[in-house]
Amino acid sequence: MKKTITSTTTDYKSKISVYFKREIRMNINYDNNNILQLKGKIIETPTYSHSVLGEGFFETKIEVKRLSQEVDILPITISERLLGELKVGDEVAIKGQFRSYNKLEDMHSKLMLTVFVRELLPLDQAPVINNINLVGYICKEPIYRTTPFGREIADILLAVNRAYNKSDYLPCIAWGRNARFVKDLQVGEKLEISGRVQSRNYQKKIGEESITKTAYEISISNICLADEPTPLAIDNLIITPTDSSTVATI
């Protein structure tokens, strides 16, 4: 029988740190855990966000077309050293990472997601429009469901380690046979995932009103188990965090 623990934030972070310490011993190259390439158009004027060691970072949004010609509107964070003269309407090709961070709103901690730009590529050298490759650990029990139209879906929260003892917590969605594959996986399983980053509008009811919100997630196209088990997988332990304030800063 699985043992379920409702953990505090500290417990949750300490469990994830087990993965990080194990990867340190294995001399993991964290850059390979999270690789994202996008090509699209800047649609908002960049605005100042924050500074790290004197380096300013700006936020804007990029419009990325799907093969269906629908578009995903994704938030990006970019250093002033890369931003240069970028403006609304400019086409850009980005290499970076999909990251999470914590934002305090109305005294509540909110999970925020952004594309962190590490490099701007020449447009003619970036044939990929939207592709992400991740290596990470399941940190909440997958949620499997079937839509009214009979489509199978599974939601996963993936902890992806990066340097300096930080982790990103990324929502992923699997479809069809991939959903069936992940539905019985355990917390602590290490996965390799490829897919695309998407935006999705949904309605949230507040009182008598419904407002439109936007979710950002990874739509999985390929998924497999990585080649080594983790301590949590071996212990058959499920961690249920009580809040979302476990998110690392950018």
Q: What residue ranges belong to the model's regions?
A:
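Single-stranded nucleic acid-binding surfaces, predominantly the OB-fold ssDNA-binding core
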Residues: I16-I250
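N-terminal amphipathic/basic-hydrophobic helices that include classical n-h-c signal peptides
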Residues: M1-R25
